[in-house]
Amino acid sequence: MILNSIRRYNTKFRDEYGQLVIACDSSSWRKEKFANYKAKRKTSREESPLDWNKFFGFLNGIRDEIAEEMSFPVVHVDRAEADDIIAVLAESTQEFGQGEPVMIVSSDKDFIQLHRHSNVKQFSPMKRGALKVDDPVFYKFEHICKGDSSDGVPNMLSADDTFVVEGGRQTPMRAKKIKEWYDACNGNASDVDALRSAMNEEQYRNYCRNKLMIDLDCIPEDIQSNIMDKYKSQQGKNNAKVLKYLITKKFSL
């Protein structure tokens, strides 16, 4: 199933977008900055009857097989999530005006912030079509303000432990207020002085907390370098073993 999905998307997009790259999750640097990042997922796994160690071992085995036997770059970097890898590779196409076309195959809306680059598009397997918004810059600002409950990141009106304490609930946030903050900095969220003036101290503190977790521009430089090194080290992989591997796996050609 995994191999057939890779084949399907490679066939669908390779002529226009070139080389397929597989981005893989590792432990996240974000947990070092915010202890509650994805904390509920760990709790859910502990309560689940599924043997998660065995499951992740299976996935890691597939990852290693593909990296060894197939010609696609498989990028797996310590402390980097797949989101980080995709973001860094997409951003690298902006250097020196290269602008090579990029297609992100994912239903994850976290990548919408990368749509600010005209050469970056996204295909959602869940929607079976393009994923897009009218204003990706505002979308990122709104996303930071609202947080991301699936990752354990509360909105910027709520405490750090909102999603890990029993009965914790977020303070409601109005869309009108988000628009006021956005307008206060004229759509330039890097204008720290404007944001500080528009928000109180706690709001701005929580905004910065969320920005670090959500904004893909905040990936540490050492991790960015490791991602690019891992990617570049896999250029020109040998295709000689691919056919034998596909036949062994009874892959549908």
In which residue ranges do the predicted regions lie?
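Long, highly charged, low-complexity intrinsically disordered interaction regions
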Residues: 78, 82, 89-173, 177, ...
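Amphipathic alpha-helical surface "interface" segments used
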Residues: 231-239
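Short Gly/charged-rich anion-binding patches and loops
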Residues: 61, 110, 241
